[in-house]
Regions:
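Non-catalytic, conformational "gating/processing" segments within enzyme and secreted inhibitor domains
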Residues: 47-60, 64, 110-111, 146-326, ...
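Terminal peptide-recognition signature
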Residues: 123, 404, 445
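Detector for small/aliphatic-rich hydrophobic stretches
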Residues: 2-218, 412
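Extended intrinsically disordered, low-complexity coil regions enriched in Ser, Thr, Gly, Ala
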Residues: 134-144, 330-333, 456-459
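Extracellular, intrinsically disordered low-complexity regions of secreted proteins
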Residues: 33-37, 331-334, 416-417
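Extended hydrophobic
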Residues: 256, 308-323, 422-460
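Internal alpha/beta scaffold segment
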Residues: 327-346
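Flexible loop/turn segments at secondary-structure boundaries
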Residues: 329-330, 362, 412-413, 446-447, ...
Length: 460
């Protein structure tokens, strides 16, 4: 797989080595000994236990869902090896997230765009847990973890659980110290009527979300199936997830959907009294509500004068990175998002930042993204997903929906926003035209969201 080689080369670039530091191949951080393999083999009978999900039309909550969502997942270990594994995972999350973004941006020119790299990566891990043989090996390679020996051995289940543990650690850090934000993640499995699902597979997905649901849907009527799924997910998300699907594949046996939402009410940030101009393109402007941030933030302008970057803390655990083109340059075509260079060498500056209030969401089908990356068969009809079901599954859409909202807790503009000490000069940075954004967990620098804002009013 060319992509695998590219991922490993990029990881080598992202991971500087020093003479007093021993390099550990990322796969070794998730490897295990013979006794672990034997323990896995002993679980094979359990792994063959299946259940048939209740109908999506059922008005009562099935017992298996109560059991699943009562099962609390322990916090991930913060051991040295766990921290090192987390660093590798977050680098691969960044690389694949940038690849997925590149696959989407051309198809959605002129539109707001948002995806969650951690959520998309977690979806691939989910299918890896359900895959066998060559499909498992291909997914492992795409995820960036290729054993040095070339022999995957019996790694699938333990490897997937360890990666989920790292991803969950990141999400727990987001929520750990912040009352001013709301962060939630929901996973739904929709199977055709009568299709059995592996109990062990579904249980293994528990660390990947705050809530997990499995229901049966009749896909033979695509419009009705889409309507039922939309209604179900809107109800379970308390109105947050809307219009997830417009249609479904009537030949599908399984549809996978993840919905991740982040809403932040930034402290000590004011909303300007008057709406401000935002240029959708060179000829079109709209009036939008704006927020005003003042403080010392990390900032840089790239050497070629193509773009500027500012990094702003928006909570105790989150960083918002904003990237704006200079002189109407096409940043997306020139910026190597897969490299971390655009996030490096920022310097503290006194800045007065003005940017729109944001309510932005995006939905992507992992199947389409893989096809755009020339991997259309990875989860196609020939995929071996025998650990999900003993039926011969046809996977339909693999939906990942992301939602991000940014508001300020202040209602008024500061009385005198130009008042400054005589010896302090503030740099004015105003985002009043198309810009890119990324949201990172502050401690690990893991990328939670990546997106583009072309019109802040879309989504309000």
């Amino acid at each position: 797989m060319n992509l695998v080689a590219e991922l490993l080369c990029l990881l080598a670039f992202l991971t500087p080595l020093t003479c007093d530091r021993v390099y550990v191949h990322p796969f070794n951080l998730f490897s295990f000994n013979k006794s672990n393999c034997e323990e896995l083999e002993s679980l094979v009978p359990e792994g063959k236990k299946t259940f048939v999900p209740a109908s999506i039309e059922s008005q009562t909550t099935p017992a298996y869902e109560n059991d699943l969502n009562k099962d609390q997942v322990e916090a991930a270990s913060h051991s040295g090896q766990g921290q090192q594994a987390l660093r590798y995972v977050k680098d691969f999350v960044h690389i694949l997230g940038a690849r997925f973004y590149s696959a989407l941006r051309e198809a959605r020119q002129g539109q707001n765009l948002l995806l969650s790299p951690t959520s998309l990566y977690g979806s691939l891990v989910s299918f890896y847990l359900g895959a066998s043989n060559q499909t498992a090996a291909d997914l492992q390679g795409l995820l960036g973890f290729v054993p040095p020996s070339g022999d995957p051995d019996c790694i699938s289940r333990v490897f997937g659980q360890e990666v989920f543990s790292s991803l969950r650690m990141i999400e727990n850090l987001v929520k750990s110290r912040d009352e001013e934000l709301q962060f939630s993640k929901m996973l739904c499995l929709f199977s055709a009527p009568g299709v059995p699902l592996s109990q062990l597979f579904v249980q293994d997905l528990l660390p990947s979300a705050d809530a997990l649901y499995a229901r049966a849907v009749d896909f033979s009527n695509p419009s009705e199936a889409a309507k039922q799924i939309n209604t179900f997910m809107e109800a379970k998300s308390k109105g947050q997830s809307k219009c997830l699907l417009t249609d479904v594949d009537p030949s599908a046996d399984l549809l996978f959907a993840v919905d991740v939402c982040l809403a932040v009410n930034v402290k000590q940030v004011s909303r300007l009294k008057e709406a401000q101009e935002f240029w959708v393109d060179s000829n079109t402007k709209v009036m939008v509500p704006m927020l005003s941030f003042t403080g010392t933030f990390n900032y840089k302008t790239d050497a070629s004068g193509t773009f500027s970057v500012v990094e702003v803390p928006i909570s105790k655990t989150l960083l918002l990175v904003l990237l704006q083109p200079i002189n109407d340059s096409d940043v997306e075509s020139e910026l190597p998002l897969q490299s971390l260079a655009w996030l490096q060498q920022l310097s503290p500056r006194k800045i007065r930042l003005t940017l729109p209030e944001l309510t932005i969401e995006g939905s992507s089908d992992l199947q389409e993204l893989l096809a755009n990356m020339e991997l259309p068969t990875l989860l196609g009809k020939g995929a071996n997903l025998s650990r999900i079901s003993d039926a011969n599954l046809t996977v339909g859409k693999v939906i990942n929906k992301a939602f991000f909202k940014l508001i300020g807790d202040g209602t008024d503009q500061p009385e005198d926003p130009t008042a400054q000490k005589e010896d302090v000069v503030f740099l004015d940075v105003t985002l009043n035209k198309q810009f890119l954004l990324a949201v990172f967990e502050e401690k690990t620098r893991a990328m939670l969201f990546l997106g583009r804002v072309t019109n802040p009013l879309h989504g309000l």
